[in-house]
Amino acid sequence: MKTIPDALFGLIGFPVSHSVSPAMQNAAFKHCKLDYLYLTIAAKPEELQNVIASMGPLNIRGLNVTIPHKIEVIKYIDSLDPAAEKIGAVNTIVNENGRLKGYNTDFGGFVRLLEHNRIAPAKQRFTLLGAGGSAHAIALAVCNLGGHLTVLARQEEKAKDLAGKMCLRLSGKTQGLELNDTNLEEALADTDVIVNCTPVGMGNLAGQSLVPPRLLRPDLTVIDAIYNPCKTRLLEDAEKRGARIINGLEMLVWQGAMSFEIWTNQKAPFRLMMKEAELALDENKK
C-alpha cells in the first residue's frame, strides 16, 4: 500500500505551529484528488538556507514563506515573478525541475479579495495603516488598479518611501504621512477603504485599535490584515458604526488559494479552503 505522497509542500517560518495553512491546503489537495501533503517547517534564520537547499532532494514541490524569512529567502531563489520583485518579498516558492521561482501572493490575494467583495480600487480612496511587508504588497495592488492611496505609519520616512516607491506613476494620487491624530482624522475624512497592516489588535495589542470609533462611519469599508482574532477591536468598532468589515482570514485564504494554483495549475476550491481555515482557527483557540 502506498504511503509516500507524490509531492510535499509546506510552510516555512518561525514560529509556525498554529498556522491554519496545512488544514486548508491539505483539504484542497484532497478535494482535487491530488496525492500531495502540506506540512509546517519551523526554521530559524540560520536554518533557512539548508531548508531551501533540501527542496530538491526531499521532493518538496513548493513552499509558503512567512515571518521572518520573506525577504531573506530571496538570496536562495533562482528567479522572481514581477510582483515579488517590485515588493521585495516572497511568500510562495515553486520548485520547477530544480529551479526555484519566488512569488508574492500577498499582492494577488489582495486583488482577489477586492474583486470578490466588489471593491473597484479605481473608484476608491484607500488609507493604509502601516508600512511593513504586507503593506507593500497591498499598496502595489491598490496603485496598479488605479486607486488613490494614503499611507500612515509611525515613522513618516517609511510612509513616504512606500507611497513614493510603489506609486510613482500615479502622481498626485498618493501620499505618505506620519501616523498621528491629526493626519489620521484628515485622511479618514476623505477615504472609502481603511486597511490595517499593523499588529495593533493582535497578541499583546489585542483589544486595541489605532482608529477612534468617532472617525468610523457607515459608508466605509474596513479591512484588517489580522486574522486572529477574527474580529479585532477595529472591526468591532467599525461594525457598530455600520461600516462594512472584512477580516484577515479571507485575505489569508485568497493568498493560499493563489499559492495552490501556482503549484497545481488547478483552480483552488476557495470556499472549502475558507471553511477549513475557520475550523482550524477555532481548534487553535481550544
From Swiss-Prot:
Domain of life: Bacteria
Pfam family, one: SDH_C
Chain positions recorded as NADP(+) binding sites: G130, A131, G132, G133, S134, A225, G248
Residue numbers binding shikimate: S19, V20, S21, T66, N91, D106, Y227
Keywords (A to Z) from UniProt: Amino-acid biosynthesis, Aromatic amino acid biosynthesis, NADP, Oxidoreductase
Pathway entry: Metabolic intermediate biosynthesis; chorismate biosynthesis; chorismate from D-erythrose 4-phosphate and phosphoenolpyruvate: step 4/7
One of the record's GO molecular function terms: shikimate 3-dehydrogenase (NADP+) activity
Enzyme Commission code: 1.1.1.25
GO biological process: amino acid biosynthetic process; aromatic amino acid family biosynthetic process; chorismate biosynthetic process; shikimate metabolic process
Enzymatic reactions: shikimate + NADP(+) = 3-dehydroshikimate + NADPH + H(+)
Transmembrane region(s): none
Top enzyme category: oxidoreductase
Active-site residue list: K70
Function as written in the Swiss-Prot or TrEMBL entry: Involved in the biosynthesis of the chorismate, which leads to the biosynthesis of aromatic amino acids. Catalyzes the reversible NADPH linked reduction of 3-dehydroshikimate (DHSA) to yield shikimate (SA).
Assembly and binders: Homodimer.
NCBIfam families: aroE, PRK00258.3-3, PRK00258.3-6
Family membership: Belongs to the shikimate dehydrogenase family.
Name of this chain's protein: Shikimate dehydrogenase (NADP(+))
Organism from which the protein derives: Dehalococcoides mccartyi (strain ATCC BAA-2266 / KCTC 15142 / 195) (Dehalococcoides ethenogenes (strain 195))
Gene name per UniProt: aroE
